[in-house]
């Protein structure tokens, strides 16, 4: 126990020296070796025994993770590493690489300042590597590169030492190309990865060795020696001469920024308040004596302590008993415990200063993305944006009726822990619907509900989440209130796709200062008057008021928007969410007496005008797509392409690398169920494949009616398709 106590003392001492702290994430594509790398770094830092590292999967502390052999949640751990005779505190987050858990990566990126990007030397950069790198650069997180599984190049692909260097060079070039395209200004500032400079390390996480140019100078081991050791299968000597943790952690300390350096640059990206205000300055300088500013990036449940909110402390210090505000709620909470992580364990400490990753209990109101502060009314941090959208839904029911109240509570809890999950109650069928990133995501959540929360559940077959949209612009439609005293004239038209993507990426929203929002929309091609008239944005739809001087309109606008939002949540054709629609109010006639223009009159009037308008404008379904990447031996390529095309897939690109064929395709999510088993049998089990979210596209006309019919039947709606006249009161 003595060693552990010493470790805790070192960690608590270093916590107070921001220049000695590095907050880093490890990111990569699935199975490129993130968790094995994390474990060996821990072993090197004396956190777990060296014999067990890599097999223990310390970071995968969840049974589900150990069973599936993949990381599902982001794990936090703190450790100490000595570099140039000085101790440094490294807060490490291991993130999942599976596309269904991309949400965890996005959240982890908010807490860290640097990222070790892990790439498999044999497979090279893969789609998920691009996705995670893009998330890191968007949050201004600086990357360094670790090329893993170098031994496989030598022993499995039998390349010679010259070919090995060429291949490794290609991997580095490709990563730099990605950085340059994703964030040109940071690339110019020197964020490229460069082996000669020392921002790239090569090695094998499993066999616990790594080499970089600074390490070669230090140990005298050359590339040729590495090649010879691998060829001879003598990994042990390599691991003794060039320990993995030393090469990687030295690189992290030398090249990745400390919190003070990082926050100067990052605060303006993730916080839109006044940089010169007291709290703005305090965050930019990671001031431990300033007001508290803490961003929650994860919520988990501890059986003893209750909800634990983990996140990054940008300003101030956390201590027990302090009272704090949480964004979005009016009442204060009292902090109960403050702790840091060591693997899956939390260690309670008295105080945590700015620049650290902290775990806090007592913040009942907090959700992922919350801002926690001692200032009343502080401008919250920008909300965390996820790259994908939920595309698959299952209905969840409790096996035993007595568990129903517990199930409702558990679903609320699960949604709080994982913000990429959407939980809704279907009012008509009474079912609870769970929408997630993919089949695996929902399977894992369902398993956890049963295992951790002890609620037995049954889940329906997965259902695809569709969207409704329109194809053309129509003349204004009149919506009348039930008492006939109020009329609204609204037309709908498709919203420009550039504006849609600006809304989705969070660039345009209603909380922006009006002039700034207006200018951004004009730059994207919207007319000035329209940009001026925006009164509501909901999902990727907007509502514009183009009327002039209508009495009482201001008082009723909120109700008109309620009607608009109701339709956007559930469109007229299939009651699926609506996307990419612009609704424009051009005229209105309102009763002078407020009693005759209440919610029961105004909401139905605006709702019906939009519903009828959408049906007149060719209401159509959009279906979600996934990009599918398949690596397969060239001889078996035919089976793989046939499998993809048989699922309405479009082959976007085919290339070859050695004897491997790499196929890139786009396939509707509806056709992807059961793909794992089928692709295995089509390619004799030799295909490696992965997916990422591929956006939405219009459903082909030939199958549109069938799909609409199936959705309506599932939701208990009438078989006949609705007509515009059904929504207009004559």
Swiss-Prot record:
Keyword Coiled coil: no
Keywords noted in UniProt: Cytoplasm, Elongation factor, GTP-binding, Nucleotide-binding, Protein biosynthesis
Subcellular location(s) of the protein: Cytoplasm
GO MF term list: GTP binding; GTPase activity; translation elongation factor activity
Gene Ontology cellular-component terms listed: cytosol; ribonucleoprotein complex
Source taxon at top rank: Archaea
Gene3D superfamilies associated with the record: 3.30.230.10, 3.30.70.240, Elongation Factor G (Translational Gtpase), domain 3, P-loop containing nucleotide triphosphate hydrolases, Translation factors
Binding site for GTP: 28-35, 94-98, 148-151
Chief localisation class: cytoplasm
Modified residues (Diphthamide): 596
Sequence similarity: Belongs to the TRAFAC class translation factor GTPase superfamily. Classic translation factor GTPase family. EF-G/EF-2 subfamily.
Function: Catalyzes the GTP-dependent ribosomal translocation step during translation elongation. During this step, the ribosome changes from the pre-translocational (PRE) to the post-translocational (POST) state as the newly formed A-site-bound peptidyl-tRNA and P-site-bound deacylated tRNA move to the P and E sites, respectively. Catalyzes the coordinated movement of the two tRNA molecules, the mRNA and conformational changes in the ribosome.
NCBIfam families noted in UniProt: aEF-2, small_GTP
Protein name according to UniProt: Elongation factor 2
């Amino acid at each position: 126990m003595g060693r552990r106590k010493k470790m805790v003392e070192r960690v608590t001492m270093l916590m107070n020296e921001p220049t000695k702290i590095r907050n880093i994430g490890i990111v990569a594509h699935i199975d490129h070796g993130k968790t094995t790398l994390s474990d060996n770094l821990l072993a090197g830092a004396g956190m777990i025994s060296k014999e067990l590292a890599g097999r223990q999967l310390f970071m995968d502390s969840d049974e589900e993770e150990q069973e599936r052999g993949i990381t599902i949640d982001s794990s936090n751990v703190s450790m100490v590493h000595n570099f140039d005779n000085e101790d440094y505190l490294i807060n490490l987050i291991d993130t999942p690489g599976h596309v269904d858990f991309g949400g965890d990566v996005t959240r982890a990126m908010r807490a860290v300042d640097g990222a070790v990007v892990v790439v498999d030397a044999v497979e090279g950069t893969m789609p998920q590597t691009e996705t995670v790198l893009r998330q890191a650069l968007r949050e201004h997180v600086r990357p360094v590169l670790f090329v893993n599984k170098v031994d496989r190049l030598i022993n499995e692909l039998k390349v010679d030492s010259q070919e090995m260097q060429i291949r490794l060079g290609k991997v580095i070039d490709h990563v730099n190309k990605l950085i340059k395209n994703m964030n040109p200004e940071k690339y110019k500032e020197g964020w490229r990865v460069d082996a000669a400079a020392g921002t790239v390390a090569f090695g094998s996480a499993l066999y616990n060795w790594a080499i970089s140019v600074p390490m070669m100078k230090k140990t005298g081991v050359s590339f040729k020696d590495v090649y010879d050791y691998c060829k001879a299968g003598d990994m042990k000597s390599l691991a003794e001469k060039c320990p993995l943790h030393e090469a990687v952690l030295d690189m992290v300390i030398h090249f990745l920024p400390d919190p003070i350096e990082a926050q100067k640059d990052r605060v303006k990206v993730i916080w839109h308040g006044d940089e010169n205000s007291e709290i703005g300055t305090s965050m930019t300088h990671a001031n431990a004596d300033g007001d508290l500013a803490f961003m929650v990036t994860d919520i988990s449940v501890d059986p003893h302590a209750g909800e634990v909110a983990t996140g990054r402390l940008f300003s101030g210090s956390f201590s027990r008993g302090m009272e704090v505000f949480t964004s979005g709620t009016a009442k204060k909470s009292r902090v109960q415990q403050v702790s840091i992580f060591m693997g899956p364990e939390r260690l309670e400490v008295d105080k945590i200063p700015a620049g650290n990753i902290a775990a806090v209990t007592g913040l009942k109101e907090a959700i992922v993305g919350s801002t926690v502060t001692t200032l009343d009314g502080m401008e919250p941090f920008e909300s965390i944006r996820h790259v994908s959208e939920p595309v698959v839904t299952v209905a969840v029911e409790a096996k035993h009726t007595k568990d129903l109240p517990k199930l409702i509570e558990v679903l609320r809890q699960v949604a709080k822990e994982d913000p990429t999950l959407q939980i809704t109650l279907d009012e008509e069928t009474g079912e609870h619907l769970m929408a997630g990133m993919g089949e695996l995501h929902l399977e894992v959540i369902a398993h956890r509900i049963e295992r951790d929360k002890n609620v037995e559940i049954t889940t329906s077959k997965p259902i695809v989440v569709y969207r409704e949209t329109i194809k053309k612009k129509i003349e204004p439609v009149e919506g009348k209130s039930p008492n006939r005293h109020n009329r609204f004239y609204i037309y709908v038209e498709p919203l420009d796709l550039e504006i849609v993507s600006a809304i989705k990426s969070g660039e345009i929203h209603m909380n922006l200062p009006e002039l700034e929002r207006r200018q951004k929309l004009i730059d994207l091609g919207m007319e000035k008057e329209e940009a001026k008239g925006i009164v509501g944005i909901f999902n990727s739809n907007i509502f514009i008021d183009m009327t002039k001087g209508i009495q009482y309109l201001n008082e009723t606008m909120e109700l008109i928007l309620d009607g608009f939002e109701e339709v956007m949540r559930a469109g007229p054709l299939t009651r699926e969410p609506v996307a990419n629609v612009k609704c424009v109010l051009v005229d209105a006639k309102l009763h002078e007496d407020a009693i005759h223009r209440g919610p029961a009159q105004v909401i139905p009037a605006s709702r019906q005008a939009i519903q009828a308008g959408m049906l007149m404008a060719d209401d159509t379904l959009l279906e979600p797509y996934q990009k599918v990447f398949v690596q397969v031996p060239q001889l078996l390529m035919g089976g793989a392409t046939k499998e993809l095309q048989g699922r309405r897939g479009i082959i976007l690109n085919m290339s070859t690398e050695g004897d491997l064929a790499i196929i890139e395709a786009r396939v509707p999510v509806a056709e992807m169920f059961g793909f794992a088993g089928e692709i295995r049998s089509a390619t004799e089990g030799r295909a490696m494949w992965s997916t990422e979210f591929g956006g939405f596209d219009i459903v082909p006309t030939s199958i549109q009616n069938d799909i609409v019919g199936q959705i309506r039947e599932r939701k208990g709606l009438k078989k006949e398709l609705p007509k515009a006249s059904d929504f207009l009161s004559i």
